[in-house]
């Protein structure tokens, strides 16, 4: 089954600009209660995923305080997790192995422009329904 049916479009996704600040990331992730968010570059392309762990390690390893996180650019924060994106024409079967290690799967078009995400929840629900039907 094509993934477009399960896509949460970009305008409904909480994401961060890669040139934003660490403070913006902390505040947005806290407000929405997310542990990971997609990063988008100036051209609208998917640029990776920022996690709470990335932020915590940055603070621990550099001695930052909350007050000076506004000086740190997101693009300068090392990321320890790679959320592999898929193209919009992918099939659900392509997402199963990614969902094991990713909270969400970023979806891009043929020009690598970020168009949305598919959450792990939707992938699990899809396979749960298939499993119940095939029982």
Which residues fall in each region the model found?
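A glycine-centered beta-loop-beta connector
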Residues: 29, 37-54, 99, 107-122
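Bateman (tandem CBS) regulatory domains
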Residues: 1-13, 70-82
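Short, flexible segments with low predicted structural confidence
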Residues: 1, 10, 26-28, 48-49, ...
């Amino acid at each position: 089954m094509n993934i477009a049916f399960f896509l949460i479009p970009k305008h409904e996704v909480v994401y961060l600009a890669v040139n934003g600040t660490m403070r913006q990331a902390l505040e947005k992730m806290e407000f929405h209660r997310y542990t990971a968010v997609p990063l988008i570059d100036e051209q609208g392309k998917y640029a990776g995923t920022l996690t709470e762990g990335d932020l915590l390690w940055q603070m621990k390893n550099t001695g930052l305080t909350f007050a000076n996180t506004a000086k740190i650019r997101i693009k300068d924060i090392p990321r320890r997790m790679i959320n592999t994106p898929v193209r919009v024409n992918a099939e659900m079967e392509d997402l199963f192995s990614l969902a094991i290690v990713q909270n969400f799967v970023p979806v891009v078009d043929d020009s690598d422009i970020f168009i949305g995400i598919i959450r792990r929840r939707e992938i699990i629900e899809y396979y749960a329904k298939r499993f119940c039907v095939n029982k």
